[in-house]
């Protein structure tokens, strides 16, 4: 046990961890029954969170309230600071909602009373919490055991982001969790204490519906959604009481000036409304008649069945979707039990429910009136079904007696009985029981007498939240912001009758399409303009809706007013996702707000068709979205061929060219998700020139590291002709091999000129190439790659082994840049420098993928093996390494995009000529850009759970910058090289010094602070001096 003042804790009793601390469950050393929560903050992190810690301690000491977590003690040890706080044994509201799904209005009122009481004292002291969310609202049971709602005490916790805000002042710091942030906070505008009211509104909405009102894939998407939509209207269920609906609409106002103030919140009628006191259900005499073959235990243990687990629900859903219809639903069928056991059912746990007995034979069913619209499930989930043994009642021979105060409702039910007497019966012959919620307008109830266990046919289909029978709105996950509400035809159906049918028939039978009037389908959903990336996802969701329903097939009118997407698992993950030739996919490519670095491969589209958007602002939005070219074709074709099908200018001629090029070129599969049609070089040659990157050439399609590409033989050329290439000079070094030898071999000629289109990138030194290529075209050998095996270099002046066949004399020619203007050469030099810099940055990402030593040090620190703490720290280390990788990849992508935009602007202005060197460097920049985007997407997918669970890391992540990482890596590289030099290990010292100098030089070009630039420049100069000293010593030796 670890001792902290008068308290102690065990490191195995981990409660949770946040951005700056780990929380353990502890106890008082003398009063062992006094449980506390001990927050341990490592002093290594204290420098970053010291201000937050001081504010939290000060605020907690000042706030003494039963609905605010109490602070008992603060202890400072050599390595840590401990806060001893009140322990809440009920977990947090997020766990409670995870277990319950949704809450009833009465339960919400009980919780909201306590939240308002805590907010009243915060408001009186001028404190804003700034991070109100279900995870920071704790639950405490008074008697240490789970009881009903009245025994739950709400506690507001985690005041790390809280601050004092005096009257008539505004704050502008980004704090909190994005889904619960007020729009003015997430948009980095000035805000006041009303930001907490928005957070309370989102929490209430989640308690009522099961999800926050406005969601998105990322904080950036949510911010864009708030910026686009000036007025927000949350989708409030129709069965919500007017007071609660008014409260939600008042709290969830986008403009803080229109938002409800604290005084109106504290005195709102919903909080002041006195809930109707619930009495025990009155037994209703029923029709007599035996139920054959019924048997059920009467033990109380089987009366209330617990909700099925997730695997069970998945199995149930599969059975329900594949099972045939079981006939028309039997609504509110009453069992043939007696009323003698009514006292057993009047438990306090049934506060929010009306238990309906099996009193009516299976051939009777009726609809509930609209006045008795059922409401959401609350405390417990009760299900009873099957066949129960009837008990003789003394009133069994009499007609049903109306329940007191419900004569009119009972008369209407009796009329419905008569009108629906001819409806079909249950094929299984067993009456069904159901659990129906009371509504505000009609607290009518029937007594469910006896008990029975659920049968498979009676199991309610759920998906993510609990569905009590009678819930007027099925669960479906919240749509992504910006998506288009679809109209369902198989999941929803509307009834024009005045009554709302409540079916809990778990059959998956489809509903005829004509049963869904469009006027009801649009309902009160929030409709917003779709983002371009969501169009493709919605197309996939529309394909799956008819075969993947998420709600019972016989839905009432309450189901049809709020169409929503299906379940989260189907958002954008349809196996049918492919790159097709539909106009919608093409529109996605040509209308995407992301920077289209390279234009269309055809000359009909103007090159450099790049939207004028800032690349840095789109990077995070890009990596969190899925492009339609995500999956590659299964037949092994390169995505670049498929991408041509997406082009608007696609034609049969284009397809035939693709087939020919596919047969000639051995093309590699692109790792990027951007279409190669967008990535083809737009820096085309001069108008009328055939030497353009818009044409298929070996330089454009050869993968890095691959051997040269051989062109097909033209008709009439002998395949066995020997080709000889004469150039002047010495053979090039392997490190400076030509990047292109796209040369058309000619027959024997004495011409000294060059007709090569690739000569500009060849080495200035001449050489003689002798070989027997399969055709008259020589392929290209990229840097570092070996040439074709049939070629060999012969020094100038020596006789070639054979002069038979074709001979070409290739004179050395000057690079194109020699004759260019200085602006051209400076821009090209800058592009090459940024290319080398980003390649060094990409090399750094390989070593940032997680620190395995951290886990080992944690084991030695805690002296325990395989503990929860070590596992969590190890996983946290891996995720943090991925965060650093993501930051570096995003920075590299930003720099590459900026370089490509610079090249585009310079070409348009005529300062940069589209020479071969320019085209090659642009091609390399674009390939690296695609690679960075692909890696960003993969890392974002891996970190989705990390970001969602660690919302408190958002400020810490903002402090992780690529510039700091690059600088630290350069310093470590120089230090390790100097250490190796001291120990005479000089294999790659010069290489590491050069790489560090290159990183610092690139860093000096992107830093903004002049002081930082000056320091980096001094460090780089010292590295260069050391390099010159090494060169001098090497020359001397």
UniProtKB/Swiss-Prot annotation:
Residues 506-515, 571-585, 658-678 have a biased composition (Polar residues). GO terms for molecular function: ATP binding; protein serine kinase activity; protein serine/threonine kinase activity. Widely expressed. It catalyses: L-seryl-[protein] + ATP = O-phospho-L-seryl-[protein] + ADP + H(+); L-threonyl-[protein] + ATP = O-phospho-L-threonyl-[protein] + ADP + H(+). InterPro entries: Atg1-like, ATG1-like_MIT2, Atg1-like_tMIT, Kinase-like_dom_sf, Prot_kinase_dom, Protein_kinase_ATP_BS, Ser/Thr_kin_STPK_Ulk-1/2, Ser/Thr_kinase_AS. It is found in: Cytoplasmic vesicle membrane. Keywords: ATP-binding, Autophagy, Cytoplasmic vesicle, Kinase, Membrane, Neurogenesis, Nucleotide-binding, Phosphoprotein, Serine/threonine-protein kinase, Transferase. It is a peripheral membrane protein. The active site is at residue 131. The modification Phosphoserine is found at residues 430, 772, 781. GO terms for cellular component: cytoplasmic vesicle membrane; phagophore assembly site membrane. SMART domains: S_TKc. The keyword Iron-sulfur does not apply. GO terms for biological process: autophagy; axon extension; axon guidance; collateral sprouting; negative regulation of collateral sprouting; protein localization; regulation of autophagy; response to starvation. Component of a complex consisting of ATG13/KIAA0652, ULK1 and RB1CC1/FIP200. Interacts (via C-terminus) with ATG13/KIAA0652. Associates with the mammalian target of rapamycin complex 1 (mTORC1) through an interaction with RPTOR. Interacts with SYNGAP1. Belongs to the protein kinase superfamily. Ser/Thr protein kinase family. APG1/unc-51/ULK1 subfamily. Serine/threonine-protein kinase involved in autophagy in response to starvation. Acts upstream of phosphatidylinositol 3-kinase PIK3C3 to regulate the formation of autophagophores, the precursors of autophagosomes. Part of regulatory feedback loops in autophagy: acts both as a downstream effector and a negative regulator of mammalian target of rapamycin complex 1 (mTORC1) via interaction with RPTOR. Activated via phosphorylation by AMPK, also acts as a negative regulator of AMPK through phosphorylation of the AMPK subunits PRKAA1, PRKAB2 and PRKAG1. This is Serine/threonine-protein kinase ULK2. It comes from Mus musculus.
